[in-house]
Amino acid sequence: MIDQYKHQQLRIGSVSPQQIRAWAKKILPNGEIVGEVTKPYTFHYKTNKPEKDGLFCERISGPIKSGICACGNYRGIGTEKEDPKFCEECGVEFVDSRIRRYQMGYIKLTCPVTHVWYLKRLPSYIANLLDKPLRELEGLVYCDFSFARSIAKKPTFLRLRGSFEYEIQSWQYSIPLFFTTQGFETFRNREISTGAGAIREQLADSDLRIITDNSLLEWKELGDEESAGNEWEEKKIRRRKDFLVRRIELAKHFLRTNVDPEWMVLCLLPVLPPELRPIIQIDGGKLMSSDINELYRRVIYRNNTLTDLLATSRSTPGELVMCQEKLVQEAVDTLFDNGIRGQPMRDGHNKVYKSFSDVIEGKEGRFRETLLGKRVDYSGRSVIVVGPLLSLHQCGLPREIAIELFQAFVIRGLIRQDVASNTGIAKSKIREKEPIVWEILQEVMQGHPVLLNRAPTLHRLGIQAFQPILVEGRAICLHPLVCKGFNADFDGDQMAVHVPLSLEAQAEARLLMFSHMNLLSPAIGDPVSVPTQDMLIGLYVLTIGNPRGICANRYNQSNSNCRNYKKEKVYKNDFKYTKELYFSSSYDALGAYRQKRIHLDSPLWLRWRLDQRVVGSREVPIEIQYESFGNYNEIYKHYQIIGSVKIEICCIYIRTTAGHISFYREIEEAIQGFWRAYS
């Protein structure tokens, strides 16, 4: 469909019977109205032509061959001659055969039928809207029981119950036995209600605004109730409040989309165009048919049987009518979702028939395989690996993938810079991988984001935009913090990369889809970019240290003098140091690490600013050293305080590691960058 802004879109939902009839109804030039499928036949076994008013009728769906009617007459399509537009003998229009791909039909159901997707699928929309148990509604739909209509001050048959000396055990089975078909219909229309018609009456009588107001009022009353301390009652109230919220949202959705709840009960059943459920002739003259055709035939057979019972057989018991209505309901259920009520319907080879649900849903369904799973231009695919040097909004593209994705842009750049005179020469330079090619590719990629997608795309974070960076190898590099949104890890997962071409797509990628702009879950608001797996292990290794602090040296056998807190440690590089080093700034400490004088977990003393207190109020120093000039040194578990007689505290040294310093610097720079960006 096309909306008021001329955007092509697809909407799936309930439609009215009038809309279904409008889709399928067709008025021929002679004034005859066609569109209703009344016969369960497909092709005649002798002529191999579609049966009239059958599932492949040419009057309803159009001719099999363009411009040729069922009689074999030919008329040119689109000619301006005064030839008739349809054949008066067979009633087939002279139109293009492609009409059979979208011209629908319909089956007029003798009794209302509940749509099984709205009844049996969880959550059950019908049960939520009517606020009734699903088991009770199922029994009503499949004629297992019925309820009495409210007829005030009128004598009714059901009021005789209780006047007898004994009670009839099961009225739902005994009542129809006393009536003929015509009498039972009169009785049922007057006093009882059962089947999908009863559901339709209740849905038609429901006022969505009243449902919303009453549900909201009940929700507030439950919230105002004081807790009784009973865990079971609190759980029951919480479950009821959740149900009321779902009911309010469902009612608002019906109001917002202008959908009547009674449309969930079908009176007209749409019939798919013939080309979407074909019958194909294979070698040997055998026919292969879509499973949908057999399910449609089953519905038409049972519907016609019910029509005959109501129209001709006046002596048929009412119980037989109810049983036939149940069979029609089950046939339509099988058409929509085979096996939803138990054992699925099978063919002669014990193969399960594929219903609408099987055709649509799943990885091999119509949407994911045919519509969403298509290969597109300007896209690639590769395994993902971790990129520890990437920023959050960057991804690493292998040169082989990048040159293919941006080849058209590189060719344009080569021609504009007069490096190549035409497209052929430009492609040859790309094949030879000349240095100028990579320079132009770098320029193109700087201003062009790419989209990364990991299947299955279950929510909007499954596809995000990144700034591409050229990397070596054949794997896509990804920042580990964005893995949670994709539900990805680095154990062999593959991701697809797409290039947005239009200016609108590039603007959407930059403004809405960049990874650093999708840090919170759109569903619950929790952070998505949180460290997991590899990052947690890396942070642990980076900040590992002895929790005992300086006390770890006290009982070290390699220390001959505990007072100097010496610690001898041998590393793989075969160098030793016997004293913990002192550094005046974090820059000096990281410089020593880069010069390989210390390791990430090497303990060291770092001078700390006096305005940032690290002293515990009740902590007792391990040792206090005094000097001859009055200076003193208080040694604690994780820090030292150096003071003098004139100045209480001259400086503070904290005991840390190069890994802790590096981690702190990264956090500090990130916070400062955040404040600069938003100040």
UniProtKB/Swiss-Prot annotation:
Keywords: Chloroplast, DNA-directed RNA polymerase, Magnesium, Metal-binding, Nucleotidyltransferase, Plastid, Transcription, Transferase, Zinc
Residues bound to Zn(2+): C69, C71, C87, C90
A cellular component term, taken from the record's GO annotations: chloroplast
Sites where the protein binds Mg(2+): D489, D491, D493
Protein name: DNA-directed RNA polymerase subunit beta'
EC number(s) from the headed UniProt entry: 2.7.7.6
Biological source species: Phalaenopsis aphrodite subsp. formosana (Moth orchid)
GO molecular function: DNA binding; DNA-directed RNA polymerase activity; magnesium ion binding; zinc ion binding
Stored HAMAP family: RNApol_bact_RpoC1
Catalytic activities: RNA(n) + a ribonucleoside 5'-triphosphate = RNA(n+1) + diphosphate
GO biological process terms, semicolon-separated: DNA-templated transcription
SMART domains: RPOLA_N (SM00663)
Coiled coil (residue ranges): none
